Amino acid sequence: MHYPIEVAGLTRDLPLFPVTDTLSIAAFIMLGDPELTESCARELLKKAPAFDYLLTAEAKSIPLIHEMARQAKAHRYCVARKRMKVYLGNALRTTVHSITTKGGQELFLSEDEAKLMKGKRILIVDDVISTGESLRALEDLVRQAGGIVCGRMSALAEGDAAKRTDIQYLAPLPLFNADGMPKV
């Protein structure tokens, strides 16, 4: 089963995958799709507030944030990592429970990136905002670093996220019943 969606002037067929016996989600994957990544970045930047740094979580939205930084001529962007690495130094840490990840996971912000964020305007970017848990975790890292969240953006807002007034997005994405029909 697939769901056709138009986003940033392009149409893509998104495959559906079950999350539970009664819930399926459409997989929106920009990895390997430079045309979609470039178009979404361009359209998001048209809506973006002024920012000092962009922030996302590993891994699916890295191409999007990279392209946004390139188009905005930003010299640096930040990525919260899913695993602690020695080169992250005295990293900041938070926990996230995402709809697409079984169980909880941690996100880490490097010591160097945390120092960059202090007192700066941080624009949080994700490929899809759904439950808002990943967004909440990124906001927590920004607060820990002493940064200021100036905006929250995504290519798609899934399910009830499309009703939020504190995010900017390009297109809504429904959740689906097990039979592939959009939930209402």
Protein language model features and the residues they cover:
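Active-site-facing substrate-recognition patch
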Residues: M1-F51
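PRPP-dependent phosphoribosyltransferase catalytic core
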Residues: H2-P4, R136-V184
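Short glycine-rich phosphate-binding loop at a beta-alpha junction
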Residues: F51-E58
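Conserved acidic residues
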Residues: D52, K120, C150
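Gly/Ser/Thr-rich loops at beta-strand to alpha-helix junctions
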Residues: E58-L64, T131
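A short helix->loop->beta-strand "cap" motif at the edges of active sites that frequently abuts
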Residues: K73-H75, G146-G147
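Short, glycine/charge-rich flexible loops or terminal/linker lids adjacent to PRPP-binding catalytic cores
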Residues: H75-I122
